[in-house]
């Protein structure tokens, strides 16, 4: 069992941390691209006072969550699951329950190496199911909307 833990700590975790940081960084960049294009590509820029006011409103409302969520969710989700969950979103309603259900089904403890791997699998499945359902909904919704008269 120590060889498995060694592989987990020396190979799996560094790999997941490296790609987790990369994908989160790319996600942040992708989230900023529309605003950058509007500002620099089309010259559409709100006044600085409006930007500062809206930023302060969002940060003051969300700041506690920036600290509380990673601290409270990470032991259950594991390091790889935390990266995946924060990138895909909807942690408390979808990712966390799927993680807990996967760990219970596999009869592993959260906070262990086994729990982290099972949690990652559960979260990955929830993301794939979520994307599948959204894709079907968008396709069906588009076909319904196209049949509605203008």
Which ranges hold each PLM region?
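Selected alpha-helical membrane-embedding segments in polytopic membrane proteins
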Residues: 55-105
């Amino acid at each position: 069992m120590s060889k498995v833990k060694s592989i987990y700590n020396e190979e799996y975790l560094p790999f997941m941390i490296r790609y987790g940081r990369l994908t989160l960084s790319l996600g942040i960049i992708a989230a900023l691209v529309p605003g950058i294009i509007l500002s620099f590509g089309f010259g559409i820029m709100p006044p600085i006072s409006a930007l500062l006011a809206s930023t302060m409103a969002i940060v003051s409302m969300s700041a506690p969550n920036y600290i509380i969520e990673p601290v409270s969710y990470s032991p259950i989700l594991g390091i790889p699951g935390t990266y995946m969950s924060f990138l895909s979103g909807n942690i408390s309603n979808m990712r966390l329950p799927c993680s807990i259900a996967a760990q219970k089904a596999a009869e592993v403890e959260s906070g262990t190496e086994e729990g982290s791997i099972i949690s990652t699998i559960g979260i990955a499945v929830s993301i794939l199911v979520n994307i599948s359902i959204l894709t079907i909904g968008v396709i069906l919704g588009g076909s319904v909307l196209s049949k509605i008269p203008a």
